[in-house]
Amino acid sequence: MKLTGDDGREYLDFLAGIGVCSLGHGDPAVLSALEAQTKKLMHVSNYFYIEQRGQVAALLSKLANDDVDGARVLADAIVAGDETTAAALGVPAAGEQVWETFFANSGAEANEGSMKLARLYAKRAGNGGNTIVCMRGGFHGRTLETIAATMQDWLQDSFRPLPGGFVACTPNDVDELRAIFKQLGSEICAVMLEPIQGESGVHPMTEEFMAAARDLAHEVGAVLIADEVQCGIFRSGKPFAFQNLWRGARHHEPCQGHCRWRAHGCRHGKEGDCRRV
């Protein structure tokens, strides 16, 4: 999309609001939906259910299962205003993995929620640990907690002392990751990473490293958090980038189901894990 600066020059927008404007700017369908909603309710707290939020959550659950065709049919029904069909399609099929969604206001808030959920899970149903392993060169937000998880000195130095409970690992260094787990074991409640790092450059995780992260987390009862603000929503060809990178992992034993990730200001988790906390 072309944007015009205050100097009158035209620019091609490849920034997309630092990765969050996945639908572009001024799309007629988006504007129409916004106008229609503002005539009803401007804001509804997460304490309450509204059907549109439920529809989007069902859509995201299908995408999380890599069911693109099912998501497309559901999306068409939602856009067409066919509430009956949308409601029917939103009901999970027998054996379908259900992913629950918590909607947030920003990526940093969603990331903080994921870290809080990981620690809460560890206390209530997991290993009781509170340490989160994060990748050097990653970026997870600008709150104090997410800066602590962002393992880049030039971003952290101005804000020290930072919250504790975070350990740095070099991306794709399986030996270092194993050494961290050997040293800390059940003190670890989560591994947090971007499947493809964005802020520090385009640095994808390898299948081997993703498999190791998931399997090591499984062994100690920890969770895996994938931050997909920069790489999610089909930017890698799949609905979410982690789906390209888990082909080498143990699909029959998916880290006890304890996987959460977030993209564009929302957080997702497998249904059973969310209900445990």
Where are these regions (language model features)?
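Conserved N-terminal phosphate-binding loop of PLP-dependent enzymes in the Aspartate aminotransferase
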Residues: 1-277
